[in-house]
Amino acid sequence: MAEEEPISVDYEVFGKVQGVFFRKYTQAEGNRLGLVGWVRNTDTGTVTGQLQGPSEKVREMQIWLQKKGSPKSRITKAQFQNERRIKKLEHSTFSICK
């Protein structure tokens, strides 16, 4: 059986997600799940990024972004868009962008 192609999805998380180590915890959770991508703060108080990896692991991370986050965060919603299958991963690590 051939290995499933990875997927890529963009995300934005709303609520109290800045100043609460959200990016650090997002990077750690992405690494734990074996995902690659990036995370950054926006000027509007949200956190955005991209996830890439096996669809099952990306789904786990999406739930984490919607419901858990960092210990002091308060997530009001998470939006996901531009989901697509990719031939190969476009990132080599899960990075925090400044």
Swiss-Prot record:
Supply the enzyme class, top level: hydrolase
Recorded GO terms, molecular function? acylphosphatase activity
Task: Give the enzyme's EC designation.
Answer: 3.6.1.7
Q: Where is the Acylphosphatase-like domain?
A: 8-98
Q: Which residues form the active site?
A: 23, 41
The keyword Hydrolase appears for this protein? yes
Key words, A-Z: Hydrolase
Q: Which transformation does this protein catalyse, written as a reaction?
A: an acyl phosphate + H2O = a carboxylate + phosphate + H(+)
UniProt family annotation: Belongs to the acylphosphatase family.
Q: What name does the UniProt record give this protein? A: Acylphosphatase-1
Report the source organism. Xenopus tropicalis (Western clawed frog)
